[in-house]
Amino acid sequence: MKRSSFHLPATCAYAILSLWGSIATAQIDNSTPEWKKEQTRGQMEDAAAQAAVKTVKVPKEVKVNVEMDKPRGVMAPWVMAVQALVSDAHLSDPDVIQLLRSAGITTVRYPGGRIADTYHFSAYRPSNWQGLDHPNVGYAPTNDLGSFSRFMEQVGTTIFTVNYGSNGAGTGPGDPAEAAAWVAYVNGNPTDTKMLGKDSAGNDWQTVGYWAGLRGAAPLPSDDGKNFLRIQHPTPFGIRYWEVGNEVFENGYFGGEGLEEDLHVPYPKEAKENAKQRKKNAGLAPEAYGKNFVQFAQEMKAVDARIKVGIPLDKPLAGQINRDEWTQDPVTGKYQQNASVSVKEDFNKGIDWDKGVLSTACNQVDFVSLHWYPSDTTQDSGYKDLDSYKLLAAPQDTLRAILAGLVDQLQKNCGQRARSIQVAFTEVGVAPYVKVPEQEEVVLGLFAADLYPQLVEYGVINADWAELHNGGFLDNRNKPGAPYFGMQMVHALMNFNDALVAASSSSSMLSVHASKRADGSLGLMLINKDAKNATTAKVQVSGDKLAAMGMRFDYGKTNPPDVRTVRGKAMEGLSNSMSIPMPPYTATVIVIPKAQ
């Protein structure tokens, strides 16, 4: 089934909106639908209302209000996503594609995180890693670009992360000509004679038609090393989103080990010399990345002007700082950590990186990429065991702070251009070293179920759960984990191009999301975040008259799924005013048709 070409309604604009009631990156003009203007004006009030009441224990009754005539966001085709690694030996397992479809997944990020900056699509081998913290992953034999392209086409689409950090020989940085050749292979026309030129190492990257021709060709009887690219697919795949480099801000410019491979400056032979050679080196500076990004974007778009090219940003945590520990300079806007605080952090690093990159590259940036692990001990309170309460609060609390900081950065550094810049979370999940007790695994599913609709409401176009395998989504036997079932619940709530509608809860311990589906039916999601206490949701729905029969889906502590599926069951007695019992640690989706 070919699903890689999505057709969007002309009125849909997938861009991040301000959380504070002003325009951020949403395109609001005379051509914008009235509901979209209303979304921008009303979003802050609705988000603030949900976060207003913060309790640890859910009340016995919670008031839920749904307004079906007030859209609050449209699900972009790329939102429901996972990250796949070239090292994943189970990516090509026969049942993976059906599992992804069952969870509503339409997008798979490739080739992964740090490995992307040593990955070379035309050779399917990494350049020699020279950084100080090797990612220690291999290449599975069935995950080359040709094989992945066939896989991706059956799932839906992808976001590619091209190599910024290293050339094929491992003697210098990634090159725009190689990235342009990758675009040519995936999206090019075999008759296109445009020359791609030579890279800094002298490699000739031929023409657009050369790479597109490889894609359409049959394998040679005697393999010349390129047969893995010959997949007999003459039609371009039409992949839209391309990211230049992975977490480039970790290249050592701000000190540390230089976790991301970036050979724009050579690595020292001795690790102890790393800080001296790389810290504050102009070749690794955010302005240098911004300048190089512009060249990447221009050469890639010269192959296919329809693509969108994005940059990784450090996570802008405005609003997440403990004000007892930090003081903000009213003139510079920089933060100073108080001397009495024992655990020191460089909060300003992310501000400096994002400002430098955006001020240099804004005119070519189509989207920005963030990575978010709300359980990460280096980014939150320092816990090593899962803090379930904090994780379940993150979609309404921490996420709003992150996006508020991002909106601020975009407005300050990109001006009017900020209106058209989209936002992707190309990695999201729970840090792998956080301990998750077996009895608490359900929390990961509730978090995923809550997170994805919230991202849709905020205008985010993509969120890649990390990882497809061994990130809680699937294990190595392809047994689904809690995040998988959480995303199944989102899939029950809505599909891409369905609209979220206004929904509010009187308690922060009961999340609510609602959708108006393509057939006019209501999708209602309720999530009880209390581990011990049940509640009853007193639901009032306006804007359309509902039928008395619907389907109910439950996932949670007392409602374990089948081996692979959260199954729905018929529900009677529904109306525009109804009471829904909610057990502890449970997500419920109710789909109710319009009354006839």
Where are the model-predicted features located?
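Bacterial N-terminal signal peptides that target proteins for export
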Residues: 2-12
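N-terminal substrate-binding region of glycoside hydrolase catalytic domains
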Residues: 31-57, 63-146, 151-174, 181-228, ...
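Carbohydrate-binding surface patches
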Residues: 507-546, 585-591
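Aromatic/acidic polysaccharide-binding cleft in carbohydrate-active enzymes
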Residues: 422-513
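Loop/turn elements at helix/coil->beta-strand transitions in domains of secreted/extracellular proteins
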Residues: 76-80, 103-108, 153-159, 237-241, ...
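N-terminal signal peptide c-region/cleavage motif recognized by signal peptidases
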Residues: 21-23
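Noncatalytic carbohydrate-binding groove/subsite architecture in carbohydrate-active enzymes
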Residues: 186, 203-228, 260, 276-443, ...
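C-terminal beta-strand-rich structural cap/linker in extracellular carbohydrate-active enzymes
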Residues: 569-596
